[in-house]
Amino acid sequence: MRLVFAGTPAVALPSLRALIDSPRHDVVAVVTRPDRPSGRGRKVKPPPVHVLADEAGIPVLSPDRPRDPEFLATLAGLAPDCCPVVAYGALLPPAALAIPRHGWVNLHFSLLPAYRGAAPVQRTLLAGDDLTGASVFQIEPAMDSGPVYGVLTERVRPTDTSGDLLDRLAEAGAGLLVAVMDGIADGTVRPVAQPAEGISFAPKLTAEEARIDWTKPAIAVDRLARAATPAPGAWTTFRDRRLKIGPVRLGAVSGRPAGPVALPAGLPAGGLPAGQIMVLPGGDVAVGTGTSPVLLGEVRPEGRGPMAAAAWARGVRIAKGETLGAIGAMPVSGGTS
């Protein structure tokens, strides 16, 4: 089939590569979001999908808005049979949806109808789900509501970050997307309507949501830190400055379903008050939560790069009884990292 692929970030690359490599399909163009400033220097760079398309010699369309008449005319002129989509990042208008004869077919990283929306993987980790997956479905005007061509399942590992899980789903999902394209071309697959039960939504994880409340149970702190890694990054405050927190380690009593890490000796008999930070004799950095303490792994102080929590603690010389993140002590917009 003649395909016009739509996608923007790195998570879309496995699918684009798989479709380019498929002998059964011809990717005649790629649609991606316009170049944007990125990184610490805020230099304008093309998104990863644009870069791969250039390397493969595939024409790239980067409309500011997919409803622009010029873009719609160009798309119609390409006469695509189908438009596969992975993390494009913009809503497609009905005029665009009507152009390919087999419509637009999206790879979504959840088991629909669960977690419709922009952040299904992060919401999966926040909820503590053990099982997730990916769905390939027909795009309709309503968000992520179209009939489903196929699904795959993936176990959530106890230490998964959103980046880890998304990488696995992107690789596995690429094969599923190609299989669906093959089935559409052969006329052997038909989409099945999503059930009316089990619908949930996955809005983008905001910076405010990513702020750690140390009064919550250790398992909730663990889930938030993993869900927010690599973005937007879980965070707290220390001495009125923002401190990003990477994945933490839980003690055996903290509630992780598998793979507990016993906390080392040196903690007070009653544990630590919520938010209180303590450097243990072996150098580990413990923080109290609403249940049992967690051990910090990697942290990122405001204006600096990531570092081991032990190295950070040595540098700041934590005083006895110091705490992290008094709720309400700092506006969410304050500071940079």
UniProtKB/Swiss-Prot annotation:
Binding site residues for (6S)-5,6,7,8-tetrahydrofolate: S110, L111, L112, P113
Keyword field contains Glycosyltransferase: no
Annotated Pfam families: Formyl_trans_C, Formyl_trans_N
Catalytic activity of the protein: L-methionyl-tRNA(fMet) + (6R)-10-formyltetrahydrofolate = N-formyl-L-methionyl-tRNA(fMet) + (6S)-5,6,7,8-tetrahydrofolate + H(+)
UniProt GO cellular component terms: cytosol
The keyword Oxidoreductase appears for this protein: no
Keywords: Protein biosynthesis, Transferase
Function statement: Attaches a formyl group to the free amino group of methionyl-tRNA(fMet). The formyl group appears to play a dual role in the initiator identity of N-formylmethionyl-tRNA by promoting its recognition by IF2 and preventing the misappropriation of this tRNA by the elongation apparatus.
NCBIfam families given in the database record: fmt (TIGR00460)
Protein name: Methionyl-tRNA formyltransferase
